[in-house]
Amino acid sequence: MSLPPSDSPQSRRPEASDPAALLRAFARLSEGTRAGSEHPLDAPDPGASTDLMDALRDRTARVAVLGQGYVGLPLAARLAGAGFEVTGLDGDPERCRRVAAGEPVLGEGSTELAAELAGHQAEGRYSIRATPARDQPPADHPLAACDVAIVCVPTPLAPDRTPDLSHVRAAGLELGAHLADDTLVVLESTTYPGTTRGAFRDAIDDGRRAAGRSPARLFLAYSPEREDPGRDPSEQRRVPKLVGGTTEASEAVTVALYESAYPDVVPTGSAEVAEAAKLFENVFRAVNIALVNEAKTVLDAMGIDVWRVLDAAATKPFGFMPFQPGPGMGGHCIPIDPFYFAWAGEQHGVRARFVELAGEVNRAMPSWVTQRLEAALEERGRALRGAHVLVLGLAYKRDVADLRESPALDLVDRLLFAGAQVITVDPHVERATTPGGAELEPVPLDAARLEAADAVLVVTDHTAFDDPLIAERARLAVDTRGILRAFAHQMGERLVLA
C-alpha cells in the first residue's frame, strides 16, 4: 500500500501495530459524543423530532438524494416506492436527461431499475435534475424544501492513496447553503470513522457561513451503502441497513426513515460505529482475497491447482470460508476501503500493517498475471512482444458493465507496454479507457478471433462467454478465474491457470 509523501504529516508512521489498539482508537471516536453535545447541528428545536417522525411515518416528508449513481439511484427508487416524494440531484446533466427519459444508465443490468424510476416519475414520486449552481436563490433551490437529504457521492483516493473527501465536502457546502433547520441529513458514502461528525459536519457549517446564514440545527446520521452491482434486486433488498446517529434523536429519526423501505434496519449506537463497520466489512473481504491470491502464486510455483485446493478445503463445515482468487481487485469499495482504514488508524497512532500488506498483494496481481502469460508464451516459443492477445472481460466482476478500479484495465496497459497486440471482448462494455489512456472498443467473441490469438487471457468470468468454444479453439488460454477447469483434460497444455 503506497503512502503519503515523506514530508507530509501522514507519512510519519507510528510503530504500534496491535489490531486491538486500532479498533480501540476507532471506538474512542464515539465515546462521550452523544451526551451534552452543544454543536448546533446536534440540537434541533424541541418538538422537531416528533414532527419529523410524523412526516416520515405518514410519508409526507420530502426527500432529496444527492448523487444518482450506483448507490443513489437504487436508493431513490426504493424510497419513492415506499411512498416518499423524492428528488434526485446529480452533477452530470446528461445522466439526468437519460434517467428522466427512462434510459438505463448503470449498464444493461439496470433496465428494471430504469423502468421502476420511470413509473415513479409518472406517478409524481420521483424527479431528477442537475445540481443547481450554489448561488441560486435559496427559495428556488430543491434542497430548500426537503425534509431529508441523503448524500451518496464518491469517496475515492487521492493520488497519494489517502482519502479524498472532496465530493463529500462539496455536498456539505451545498447542504449548508440551502437546507432549512430541523432537516435530517444522512451520509451514505463509504468513509473513515469520524467523517460524519467531523469533516462532513464542518463542510455544512462552512456552507452556512458562506451563504451568510446562521448555524443550522439539523439531525445528522450515517448509514453506509451496501449495494452490490449485479446482485439480484430481490436479494439486495434483504440486506440489513445499518444506521448510526450523532445523537439519539438523530439515530431514531434515521431508523424511522429507513424502516419505511428496508425490512431489517440495525441501529449501531453511533455514526462512528456504522462508519467503521462498513470499512471493516470490505477490509475483511480484501484481506481474504489477498490471502487466496497469495496462495495462488505459492501453489502455482509448486505446480498445484489453487482451485482444487479451495474446493477440498471448503468441504470442512466449520472454521473455513472460501474466497476465490483472481487477477486483482476492482469495484467502488474493496480496492479503496483498506486505504481509508489504514489511514484512519495512522491518525490515531496505530499502523494497520496486515491491511497494508493485503493491499500490496492485491495490487501486485496484474503484474503477476502478466508475467505468467509471458512465461506461458515463451514456453511455446513465442515472445509477448508482438503476440496477439485476446483479453476476455473488462468489467471488474461477472455480468456487470462496471469498470471502476478493474484490474483488466491495468492488465491491458501492461500488455500494451510490453508490445503485445491486444483485442478485448466484453459483452457488457461498449468502450473503455485504460489508466494509461488506451481507448478500447470490445468486439464480439467468435471462433476466428480465438483461433487467431496467440493467447486468450480470461480476466472476467462473464456467463455470456462460450466456455466450450474457448476450450475448443484457443491455442493457449491463460485463465485467471478458473472457468475452463472443467475442460482441463480436453485442453491439456493449452490451458494455464493463473
How should these model regions be labeled?
Residues 2-498:
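Structural/interface elements that position substrates and couple domains in central-metabolism enzymes
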